[in-house]
């Protein structure tokens, strides 16, 4: 039986500003990418999300970002390597402290937004993130875009790295994500999304935006928690995968 992880970006509300339905998503996903305060989230809200995740036995990951709350972490930044390393260490460490208080622990790191996309191809910034993880906890798993050069780079530097696919994003024929600035980049139909991901899990391929089939090898599937139909989409995806006898389990298990 093929096993796959379902993850979502959570803990992104800030003060009076609400983002997503964390409680509902935690009933569906197996891993939670929790904001660390740089692109979204505040300490009290992050702690609430961590406690809720612990109660549901959902695995926790640090959703690290560029320091960009105004742009929700989606603006490219040319950050110096030492600054980026320090920023990532700071975010992981902060989340580790809150997670301990919530009775859980951080098991992996998934960069957010522009940082995620940049380190998929930018070796300098990728190494800065890798150095941060090695410095604070080399046992943390790094989540990377399926097909990116980051996967082999991280593994060559001694980290465990897993590949991720996106349920609600369109793909180019080259296997990269279609830019959010392009029409059709974000998918909203729960049934369509679920069938696309079922094909991915069963055959290792996905239909690109031009109709061609692209090979994608992934250990985890992300459903963005901030999309309008996020909960409905995640629920339908889980239903379809379970109906097809797919085992849903976190890629980063508990440490012995």
Swiss-Prot record:
The protein, known as: 5-oxoprolinase subunit A 3
One Pfam family matching this protein: LamB_YcsF
Keywords, comma-separated and alphabetical: ATP-binding, Hydrolase, Nucleotide-binding
InterPro entries: Glyco_hydro/deAcase_b/a-brl (IPR011330), LamB/YcsF/PxpA-like (IPR005501)
Enzyme Commission identifier(s): 3.5.2.9
GO biological process, one term: carbohydrate metabolic process
Cysteine disulfide partners in this protein: none
Protein family (similarity comment): Belongs to the LamB/PxpA family.
Catalysis: reaction(s): 5-oxo-L-proline + ATP + 2 H2O = L-glutamate + ADP + phosphate + H(+)
Function: Catalyzes the cleavage of 5-oxoproline to form L-glutamate coupled to the hydrolysis of ATP to ADP and inorganic phosphate.
């Amino acid at each position: 039986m093929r096993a796959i992880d379902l993850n979502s970006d959570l803990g992104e509300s800030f003060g009076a500003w609400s983002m997503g339905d964390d409680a509902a998503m935690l009933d569906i996903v197996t891993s939670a990418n929790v904001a660390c305060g740089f692109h979204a989230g505040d300490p009290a809200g992050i702690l609430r999300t961590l406690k809720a995740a612990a109660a549901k036995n959902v695995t926790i990951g640090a959703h690290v970002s560029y320091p960009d709350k105004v742009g929700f972490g989606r603006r490219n930044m040319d950050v110096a390597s030492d600054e980026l390393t320090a920023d990532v260490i700071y975010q992981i460490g902060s989340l580790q402290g809150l997670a301990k208080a919530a009775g859980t622990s951080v098991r992996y790191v998934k960069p957010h937004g522009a940082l995620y996309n940049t380190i998929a191809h930018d070796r300098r910034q990728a190494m800065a993130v890798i150095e941060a993880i090695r410095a604070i906890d080399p046992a943390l798993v790094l989540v990377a875009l399926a097909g990116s050069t980051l996967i082999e780079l991280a593994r060559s530097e001694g980290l465990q790295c897993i590949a991720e696919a996106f349920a609600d994003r369109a793909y180019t024929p080259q296997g990269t994500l279609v830019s959010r600035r392009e029409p059709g980049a974000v998918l909203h139909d729960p049934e369509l999304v679920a069938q696309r991901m079922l094909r991915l899990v069963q055959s290792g391929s996905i239909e690109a935006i031009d109709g061609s089939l692209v090979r994608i090898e992934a250990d985890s599937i992300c459903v963005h928690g901030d999309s309008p139909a996020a909960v409905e989409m995640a629920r339908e995806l889980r239903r379809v995968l379970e109906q097809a006898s797919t085992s849903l389990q976190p890629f980063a298990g508990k440490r012995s």
